[in-house]
């Protein structure tokens, strides 16, 4: 158990919050589970998504007409020479500088593992669809080298909302994380508000300029 924290909860009847209404049990994921081996269709999907994310990967930005740099900007140099011959003065901004663009993004993925995800759609269990979607998304974010974390949530009652860390922000996306995803099991109820507030709190501590929370759920309250 990492921590126990309390959060308010919205009452739609009163149109107000109940202070300190829910208790979140924040814990580490179990290390069990076999390494998930994707089938041919899933591998094709992974490759497709990775190609799409590769297009978003930060590239080197070339800045021309700079005061200093490791390479001369020929166009700027010619203009400067022409200006000097014409009026006796010219600009010193005759260099090219390049630097790596930064996306500066942190993403928190929150996954619903309540009992309703044990239902079946088109001959597939919802939780298995969630796992495949989660791995696909995480692979894409890893391709972009974005900082991201993965958490799951379920609840027994308002004093026991379980949020589990599958991957922390400072962890790499590796086979150990894949095993944790493979070990996910459905159970209990969908108390979403406290889990969202806890994930928002974790995300708010990140130094990145842009922060994104993604909720992966079947949308069915249990």
Regions of interest found by a model, annotated:
Residues 98-126, 217-218:
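MIDAS-like acidic motif and immediate structural context at the N-terminus
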Residues 111-113, 134, 199, 208-222:
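DG-centered beta-turn motif at the end of beta-strands
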Residues 117-148, 199:
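…and closely analogous acidic/polar surface helices at protein-protein or active-site interfaces
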Residues 30-35, 113-124, 178-185:
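Glycine- and acidic
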